[in-house]
C-alpha cells in the first residue's frame, strides 16, 4: 500500500511541532527544500486536513496548520540571488506562501551581492599615472574591461533588488559574494558576522 499524498511531509511537520511544544530549543531552524517542493511541503497539512475530516491525521494536520499560521511560532525566511530569474521565483513563492499556506514571511536573505568598488569610474591610465604605476596597453585594456564588468554587474544586481523592493516590500539581509573557489572557516565566519549584523539592525518588531 502507499501513503496518502503529503503524509511524509505532515510527519516532518509533526516532529517539528513536537520539538517546539516540548521546548527542545529556543529556536528551531528548518532548512526547507527548494521553492517548488517547499510550497508542497507546507501545503501538505491543508490537503490532509481537508481529506481526513476526523481522526488522528486530521488532528495532526490541524495542529500543524495552527503552528504554521501563528507568527509567534513560525516564520519563513526565503533566500535568493540578486538576479532576474531567482527574484521572479522568490516573488511567486512569497505570494503563494502567504495566500495558500497562510504563513508569515520574515526578512529575505540575498546571497552573493557584489558591493560596488569606489574608483572604477576613473580612467585606468589616469589612475595608473596618479599612482606612479606603469601599465602595458594590454593591461590597460584588461583592467578597463574588468572595471566595466564589475560596474555592470553591480548595476544589474541593484536594479533587481530595487524591483524586489517594489514588488515585495520585505526587509532584506544582504550577504556579499565571496570571491574564492572554496569557502574556508574565515569566509564562513565573515558571512555569519554579516548576517548577525543585519539581524541586529532589524526593526525589533520583526524579531519579536
Protein language model annotation of sequence segments:
Residues 8-167:
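Conserved catalytic-core segment of NTP-binding enzymes
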Residues 172-174, 178, 182-208:
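C-terminal accessory extensions appended to soluble enzyme cores
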Residues 1-5:
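Conserved phosphoryl-transfer catalytic core
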Amino acid at each position: 500500500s502507499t501513503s496518502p499524498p503529503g503524509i511524509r511531509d505532515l510527519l516532518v511537520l509533526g516532529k517539528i511541532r513536537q520539538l517546539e511544544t516540548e521546548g527542545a530549543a529556543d529556536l528551531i531552524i528548518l532548512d526547507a527544500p527548494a521553492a517548488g517542493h517547499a510550497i508542497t511541503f507546507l501545503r501538505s497539512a491543508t490537503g490532509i486536513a481537508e481529506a481526513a475530516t476526523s481522526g488522528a491525521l486530521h488532528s495532526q494536520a490541524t495542529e500543524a496548520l495552527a503552528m504554521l499560521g501563528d507568527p509567534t511560532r513560525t516564520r519563513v525566511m526565503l533566500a535568493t540571488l540578486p538576479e532576474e530569474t531567482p527574484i521572479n521565483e522568490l516573488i511567486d513563492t512569497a505570494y503563494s506562501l502567504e495566500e495558500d499556506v497562510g504563513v508569515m514571511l520574515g526578512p529575505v536573505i540575498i546571497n552573493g551581492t557584489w558591493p560596488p568598488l569606489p574608483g572604477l569610474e576613473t580612467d585606468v591610465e589616469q589612475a595608473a599615472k596618479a599612482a606612479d604605476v606603469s601599465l602595458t596597453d594590454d593591461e590597460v585594456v584588461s583592467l578597463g574591461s574588468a572595471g566595466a564588468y564589475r560596474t555592470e554587474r553591480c548595476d544589474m544586481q541593484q536594479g533587481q533588488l530595487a524591483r524586489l523592493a517594489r514588488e515585495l516590500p520585505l526587509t532584506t539581509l544582504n550577504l556579499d559574494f565571496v570571491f574564492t573557489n572554496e569557502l574556508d572557516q574565515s569566509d564562513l565566519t565573515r558571512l555569519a558576522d554579516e548576517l548577525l549584523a543585519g539581524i541586529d539592525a532589524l526593526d525589533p518588531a520583526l524579531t519579536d
